[in-house]
Amino acid sequence: MGARGAPSRRRQAGRRLRYLPTGSFPFLLLLLLLCIQLGGGQKKKENLLAEKVEQLMEWSSRRSIFRMNGDKFRKFIKAPPRNYSMIVMFTALQPQRQCSVCRQANEEYQILANSWRYSSAFCNKLFFSMVDYDEGTDVFQQLNMNSAPTFMHFPPKGRPKRADTFDLQRIGFAAEQLAKWIADRTDVHIRVFRPPNYSGTIALALLVSLVGGLLYLRRNNLEFIYNKTGWAMVSLCIVFAMTSGQMWNHIRGPPYAHKNPHNGQVSYIHGSSQAQFVAESHIILVLNAAITMGMVLLNEAATSKGDVGKRRIICLVGLGLVVFFFSFLLSIFRSKYHGYPYSDLDFE
């Protein structure tokens, strides 16, 4: 039965082929070649992607952050295919660039990359790289980048969006802040492991030893503990430190200042009310101390019972300190809160 059915099926297939239009054979041949070409192109893409990932994993095995020039940047970051996210720090670490902020940011970036490399969650979906200005000037020009350091996320597909550029000026460059930003952009959560830092412990031990030694040497005369002036000075120092934003600096880790790479101008005051530099805190601390000194002199001139001429001089000096430095402080406030209507002496 099966032997008799086979010839009949072949005859039916032959009849169907005879009824096909004559011009359909070139079309079928073209369609077959197109399918073969598409299959070959897809295989080529897969092989190219595998080679790129293998190369990136090899670099990552040697160091957590690999440096890139223009050619490597275009091949591994800009050119498809990609199935991985790339975090890139654009920086200027050469000594002649004199970018102290770049060195500080690089230390935090290294801590973050090492935390990812040695974590149990490490995989080939996220890599860390660096482009130095002196090694990839063409990359800076291609991206129209005019400041360093800058952190960018390049997603597996498509172009980077605005949120893929880390807001360093507002958030700071602490490794923990970078890890939060990366988790938001890639859904990869990195637990930051910092190397042990014993400087705080050593400083505390030295302070305790110094205080203990002082108390031991003065054990027969401890009246200085009840000195109101000494405790007032200590309290003022704490108040000046806290009102100048030192705690914000400790939490956010902002740069000390910002140097414009084009004209070399250094900014010590941040132009936004949402951020500040470390130098800005030092300036505010000095201004607050000077204003306080002026108020103390005014109080001394009003309450003391000395020579009238001397009291008048003290009063003028105190008034000058308060007016001058408070005007300076107010001008800084106006530069950060644009549109603030009040001012004293104009320093702008």
From Swiss-Prot:
Q: What is the effect of changing C99S?
A: Reduces N-glycosylation of cysteine-proximal acceptor sites
Signal peptide (UniProt feature, chain positions): 1-41
State any GO BP term from the record.
Answer: protein N-linked glycosylation via asparagine
Q: Where in the cell is it found?
A: Endoplasmic reticulum membrane
GO MF terms held by the record: magnesium ion transmembrane transporter activity
Per the UniProt entry, the disulfide pairs are C99-C102
**In the UniProt record, does the keyword S-adenosyl-L-methionine occur?**
no
Source superkingdom:
Eukaryota
Per the record, membrane topology reads: Multi-pass membrane protein
Q: Which stretches are transmembrane?
A: 197-217, 222-242, 277-297, 313-333
**Where does it primarily localize?**
endoplasmic reticulum
| Gene Ontology CC | endoplasmic reticulum membrane; mitochondrion; oligosaccharyltransferase complex; plasma membrane
- Tissue specificity as recorded in UniProt: Expressed in most non-lymphoid cells and tissues examined, including prostate, lung, liver, colon, heart, kidney and pancreas.
Keyword Transmembrane included in the entry's annotation: yes
| Alphabetized UniProt keyword annotations | Disulfide bond, Endoplasmic reticulum, Intellectual disability, Magnesium, Membrane, Signal, Transmembrane, Transmembrane helix, Transport
Q: In which pathway does it act?
A: Protein modification; protein glycosylation
Domain Thioredoxin: where?
59-187
Q: Which InterPro entries match?
A: OligosaccharylTrfase_OST3/OST6, Thioredoxin-like_sf
Disease linkage in the record?
Intellectual developmental disorder, autosomal recessive 7: A disorder characterized by significantly below average general intellectual functioning associated with impairments in adaptive behavior and manifested during the developmental period.
Q: How does it assemble?
A: Accessory component of the STT3B-containing form of the oligosaccharyltransferase (OST) complex. OST exists in two different complex forms which contain common core subunits RPN1, RPN2, OST48, OST4, DAD1 and TMEM258, either STT3A or STT3B as catalytic subunits, and form-specific accessory subunits. OST can form stable complexes with the Sec61 complex or with both the Sec61 and TRAP complexes. The association of TUSC3 or MAGT1 with the STT3B-containing complex seems to be mutually exclusvice.
Q: What does this protein do?
A: Acts as accessory component of the N-oligosaccharyl transferase (OST) complex which catalyzes the transfer of a high mannose oligosaccharide from a lipid-linked oligosaccharide donor to an asparagine residue within an Asn-X-Ser/Thr consensus motif in nascent polypeptide chains. Involved in N-glycosylation of STT3B-dependent substrates. Specifically required for the glycosylation of a subset of acceptor sites that are near cysteine residues; in this function seems to act redundantly with MAGT1.
Tell me its family.
Belongs to the OST3/OST6 family.
Q: What is this protein called?
A: Dolichyl-diphosphooligosaccharide--protein glycosyltransferase subunit TUSC3
Q: Which gene encodes it?
A: TUSC3
